[in-house]
């Protein structure tokens, strides 16, 4: 099954949004396969956001990610990357659809609460970076109540 990397950013952690965000993914029927509560080192943040290193906002983004703890997670399920992006909402909170995480909780693009993989391939890269030790193997007993096969 498809996997996606999801990170609750420092503002989401500080604002006490961890439980609600996890609940949204669980209620959709996705499986939590890995989770870490951690502080991010500068070099690690730079590596994670390397594709944005030429952007003018890159230094501020790195400072933001290292400013406090994050919750790094791997979610698994059918079409979890695309569906996860819909649950999260547009990068710019004012463009996010009502009911999405960013529409509900974010005001500024620089404090937009959450990161989610934007493609299956990027998800694989992010998961390998953040979870080099691997993931928990398990399947919920609810699987047949969520998926047809």
Swiss-Prot record:
Q: What induces it?
A: By salicylic acid, benzo (1,2,3) thiadiazole-7-carbothioc acid S-methyl ester, jasmonic acid, and abscisic acid.
Q: Which Gene3D superfamilies match?
A: Nucleoside diphosphate kinase-like domain
Q: Which SMART domains match?
A: NDK
Q: Name one GO molecular function term.
A: ATP binding
For this protein, the record's CDD domains field holds: NDPk_I
> Which of this chain's residues are annotated to bind ATP?
9, 57, 85, 91, 102, 112
Which cofactors is this protein said to need?
Mg(2+)
Q: What do we know about how this protein assembles, alone or with others?
A: Homohexamer.
Q: Which NCBIfam families match?
A: PRK00668.1
Identify this protein by name.
Nucleoside diphosphate kinase 1
């Amino acid at each position: 099954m498809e996997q996606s990397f999801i990170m609750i950013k420092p503002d989401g952690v500080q604002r006490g949004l961890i439980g609600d965000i996890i609940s949204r993914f669980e209620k959709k029927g996705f499986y939590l396969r890995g989770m870490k509560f951690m502080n991010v080192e500068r070099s690690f943040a730079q590596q994670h956001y390397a594709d944005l290193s030429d952007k003018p906002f890159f230094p501020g983004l790195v400072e933001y990610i290292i400013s406090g703890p994050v919750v790094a997670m791997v979610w698994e399920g059918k079409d979890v990357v695309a569906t996860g992006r819909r649950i999260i909402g547009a990068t710019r909170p004012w463009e996010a659809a009502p009911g999405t995480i960013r529409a509900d909780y974010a005001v500024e693009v620089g404090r937009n609460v959450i990161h989610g993989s934007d493609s299956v391939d990027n998800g694989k890269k992010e998961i390998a970076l953040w979870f080099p030790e691997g993931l928990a193997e398990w399947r919920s007993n609810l699987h047949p109540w969520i998926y047809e096969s």
